[in-house]
Each structure stands twice: as structure tokens, then as C-alpha cells.
């Protein structure tokens, strides 16, 4: 199995070259003509781009043997997840993004469904 990774790299390069040729065969539309003509050309160009994208995905999955469905992500149990805003909460929307805060104790999130 010493040459297996080289074969896989070569397959990947073939797939990338083929996909590159597909994208090069569909240049962007020209900016000439009436507004309606330009709009129609852009619409047809975007449809061809979508087709090329789906063909490229099929080529990659064929050459690389990728599964169609993504690999499931292992998440911690929901009862251990906690939104903790006690430290450094900003209003920019980017602070605090990253690994989830996991509390030590497991608080009861949902009761059994009976009201008091």
C-alpha cells in the first residue's frame, strides 16, 4: 500500500484539471446589449454555472470515492450545553464565538411536562 496516496493525489489532480476545464468553458457574459438581453445572458450563465458545479461534485465523488452524505458530527449531550454570558459579553456578535461552554452540573432543562 505504499503507492496508494500517490495514486489518490494523481486522481485528485485529474479531477481538478477536468473541473477547471469545465469552468473555463463558461466565461462570464458580455456587458453589451439591452438590459433585458444582459439579464437573460446572466441568468443562462448562472444556470450553466450551477450545472458545472453539480458536475464537478459528481466528478470529485467519483474520483475520490467520497460519500454523498457528510460525516456526522459528534456533539456533547444537550443537557451539558450552557449559554454562559457572565464573562466578556460583547455586542459585536463575534465575541464569545468558538467552543461551547459546558457546565459542570447538569441542570434540568425540561421538566416532565406537568405544570405546578
UniProtKB/Swiss-Prot annotation:
Q: Indicate where the modification Phosphoserine is found in the sequence.
A: 5, 92, 99
Map out region (Homomultimerization) in residue numbers.
18-26
Alphabetical keyword list:
AIDS, Host cytoplasm, Host nucleus, Host-virus interaction, Methylation, mRNA transport, Phosphoprotein, RNA-binding, Transport
Tell me yes or no: is RNA-binding among this UniProt entry's keywords: yes
Q: Which domain of life is it from?
A: Viruses
GO MF annotations in UniProt: DNA-binding transcription factor activity; RNA binding
Q: Where is this region: Disordered?
A: 23-49, 86-116
Report what the Swiss-Prot or TrEMBL entry states about this protein's PTMs: Asymmetrically arginine dimethylated at one site by host PRMT6. Methylation impairs the RNA-binding activity and export of viral RNA from the nucleus to the cytoplasm.
Record remark: domains: The RNA-binding motif binds to the RRE, a 240 bp stem-and-loop structure present in incompletely spliced viral pre-mRNAs. This region also contains the NLS which mediates nuclear localization via KPNB1 binding and, when the N-terminal sequence is present, nucleolar targeting. These overlapping functions prevent Rev bound to RRE from undesirable return to the nucleus. When Rev binds the RRE, the NLS becomes masked while the NES remains accessible. The leucine-rich NES mediates binding to human XPO1.
Q: How does it assemble?
A: Homomultimer; when bound to the RRE. Multimeric assembly is essential for activity and may involve XPO1. Binds to human KPNB1, XPO1, TNPO1, RANBP5 and IPO7. Interacts with the viral Integrase. Interacts with human KHDRBS1. Interacts with human NAP1; this interaction decreases Rev multimerization and stimulates its activity. Interacts with human DEAD-box helicases DDX3 and DDX24; these interactions may serve for viral RNA export to the cytoplasm and packaging, respectively.
**Family listed:** Belongs to the HIV-1 REV protein family.
Function, in words: Escorts unspliced or incompletely spliced viral pre-mRNAs (late transcripts) out of the nucleus of infected cells. These pre-mRNAs carry a recognition sequence called Rev responsive element (RRE) located in the env gene, that is not present in fully spliced viral mRNAs (early transcripts). This function is essential since most viral proteins are translated from unspliced or partially spliced pre-mRNAs which cannot exit the nucleus by the pathway used by fully processed cellular mRNAs. Rev itself is translated from a fully spliced mRNA that readily exits the nucleus.
Its name, as the record gives it, is Protein Rev
Organism of this sequence: Human immunodeficiency virus type 1 group M subtype D (isolate Z6)
Supply the source organism's classification: Viruses, Riboviria, Pararnavirae, Artverviricota, Revtraviricetes
What gene is behind this protein? rev
Amino acid at each position: 500500500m505504499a503507492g496508494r496516496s500517490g495514486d489518490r493525489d494523481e486522481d485528485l489532480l485529474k479531477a481538478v484539471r477536468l473541473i477547471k476545464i469545465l469552468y473555463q468553458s463558461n466565461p462570464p457574459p458580455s456587458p453589451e446589449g439591452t438590459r433585458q438581453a444582459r439579464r437573460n445572458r446572466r441568468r443562462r450563465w448562472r444556470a450553466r454555472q450551477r450545472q458545472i458545479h453539480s458536475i464537478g461534485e459528481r466528478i470529485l465523488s467519483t474520483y475520490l470515492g467520497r460519500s454523498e452524505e457528510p460525516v456526522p458530527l459528534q456533539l456533547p449531550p444537550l443537557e451539558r450545553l450552557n449559554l454562559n454570558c457572565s464573562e466578556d459579553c460583547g455586542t459585536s456578535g463575534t465575541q464569545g464565538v468558538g467552543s461551547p461552554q459546558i457546565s459542570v452540573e447538569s441542570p434540568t432543562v425540561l421538566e416532565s411536562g406537568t405544570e405546578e
